[in-house]
């Protein structure tokens, strides 16, 4: 993407009513104005709040919102030029149950309050395969604790990935730490019992993985 196109998207994001772009200082130096008040002050309803972490272009966030009008969806990514597409599509379609936040995922506890989030989706994250990058894996122990701090007591986690490494790493960690695994499969499109909410949505890159014969894995779990 050219620099001019990026700048144009950044400017449009500033005008989009479904895009929130707090600075790091706004989150860490003060109490973020929407923390604990997303339902009341942003969505203006009491529907469950669902997050997609590392949402990229926002395809999954938008499609989840289309299929579930009784839930509110928030895509989180540090690269606003990417989720510009999802934000624009949501506005064009009049989807009022969609929002996007430009921030780092490690700041999630500054954005949401305890018991504010019902579900979290992690879709096709960078597996950070090198050992020295373990701290950046979105399902490591530290990240799981952050998620637990904003999830409701019965909150659900979803991990959908083409990385067999990430799938195996996460399963091992969940077993080792005593978390509750609700469903897991290493190739969801070859399992007739895979949840429709998982197989019914495919992003551009997921379709490419499937065309190349790559299996898509999925884990649904609760953090204890």
From Swiss-Prot:
GO CC, any one term: tRNA methyltransferase complex
Enzyme Commission code: 2.1.1.33
Cited InterPro entries: SAM-dependent_MTases_sf (IPR029063), tRNA_(Gua-N-7)_MeTrfase_Trmb (IPR003358), tRNA_methyltr_TrmB_bact (IPR055361)
Reactions that this protein is recorded to catalyse: guanosine(46) in tRNA + S-adenosyl-L-methionine = N(7)-methylguanosine(46) in tRNA + S-adenosyl-L-homocysteine
A molecular-function term among this protein's GO annotations: tRNA (guanine(46)-N7)-methyltransferase activity
Primary enzyme class: transferase
The keyword S-adenosyl-L-methionine is annotated on this UniProt entry: yes
NCBIfam families, alphabetized: PRK00121.2-2, tRNA (guanosine(46)-N7)-methyltransferase TrmB
Record-stated family: Belongs to the class I-like SAM-binding methyltransferase superfamily. TrmB family.
Protein name from the UniProt record: tRNA (guanine-N(7)-)-methyltransferase
Organism: Christiangramia forsetii (strain DSM 17595 / CGMCC 1.15422 / KT0803)
